[in-house]
Design a protein with these regions (language model features):
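Conserved catalytic-core segment of nucleotide-activated headgroup transferases in glycan assembly
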Residues: 137-203, 207-214
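Donor nucleotide-sugar binding/catalytic pocket of nucleotide-sugar-dependent glycosyltransferases
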Residues: 113-144
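Short alpha-helical segment that forms part of, or immediately flanks, the ligand-binding pocket
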Residues: 218, 241-246
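Extended catalytic core of nucleotide-activated donor transferases of GT-like folds
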Residues: 5, 45-124
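Acidic donor-binding loop of glycosyltransferase active sites
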Residues: 77, 219-236
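Conserved alpha-helical elements of sugar-nucleotide-dependent glycosyltransferases
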Residues: 11-22, 171-178, 236
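Acidic, amphipathic alpha-helical patches
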Residues: 68, 145, 214-220
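N-terminal strand-loop element at the rim of the active site
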Residues: 7-13, 20-67, 197
């Protein structure tokens, strides 16, 4: 089978990362063909993300989801997979069987597409009474045991709380203030952020540029003793949360 995977924006967030894993194992385990489509109309694509996809898959830029019907016949697509909030919108095809992966709580009246699934067991139980099945993210980390402590001049006895995710995903103002108060009182604590928009200046609140490099991301997680999160929207199954969890 030929399966298309549609990504709105090629960025460093969980949707692009998880879609890569689904497309990869769709070929490796299920022996299907994966084709990647992304919306050229979005403004914040990361070149390194597009490059990584192109090393493994055929990648096509389209002018919105509306162009998918054209490629469905041209490339003989059996299905098109897309992650989104879950509400009815224009990201569904009338000609290609569309697989909807819902990330957020929705009413059952929002069901659409050929198949509709939730991203987590919690989402399925809490908001659909298990009427809608769930498929969680594939959580995979590189095996390296190296960390960034020496490079970042973090002392061995310091406790490191870390967070990585979308640039705007650590947006609770009162948490920002709490972190500043904490580092003033505790010199043995530091906070480390990957791809998070900088919200303060302090030598023990460190902000690192985002990366799609799996080795670097694992080094970042290895540097941390625990994850800290401060997203106003919350998560139903955050990929970053899963990555920290399997680290132990």
């Amino acid at each position: 089978m030929n399966i298309g995977f549609f990504i709105g924006e090629m960025n460093l967030r969980g949707v692009a990362n998880s879609t890569y894993q689904y497309a990869y194992y769709n070929e490796r385990l299920l022996k299907n063909k994966s084709l990647i489509f992304y919306n050229k109309e979005e403004k914040f694509h990361k070149k390194e993300v597009i490059s990584k996809f192109r090393k493994k898959f055929k990648v096509i830029g389209v002018n919105g989801f509306k162009e998918m019907d054209h490629y469905g016949k041209k490339l003989n697509l059996d299905y098109i997979y897309v992650q989104k909030g879950g509400q009815k919108d224009h990201n569904v095809s009338n000609k290609i069987k569309t697989l909807i992966h819902s990330l957020y709580p929705q009413n059952l009246k929002e069901l659409h597409g050929h198949k509709y699934i939730c991203v987590s067991e919690w989402l399925s139980k809490k908001f659909t009474n298990t009427k809608i099945p769930f498929v969680p993210y594939i959580v995979k980390l590189h095996k390296t045991k190296n960390n960034l402590k020496k490079k970042l001049k973090i002392k061995k006895n310091q406790i490191v709380f870390g967070c990585h995710g979308g640039e705007s995903s650590f947006d609770l103002k009162f948490v920002h203030q709490t972190l500043l108060e904490t580092v003033k009182k505790r010199k043995d604590i530091c906070f480390l952020f990957l791809n998070i928009k900088k919200f303060c200046n302090h030598p023990r609140i460190i902000f690192l540029k985002g990366s799609f490099d799996e080795v670097y991301k694992k080094k970042f997680i290895n540097t941390c003793d625990a994850m800290i999160y401060g997203r106003s929207l919350g998560e139903s199954f955050g990929l970053a949360c899963g990555e920290f969890s399997i680290q132990g």
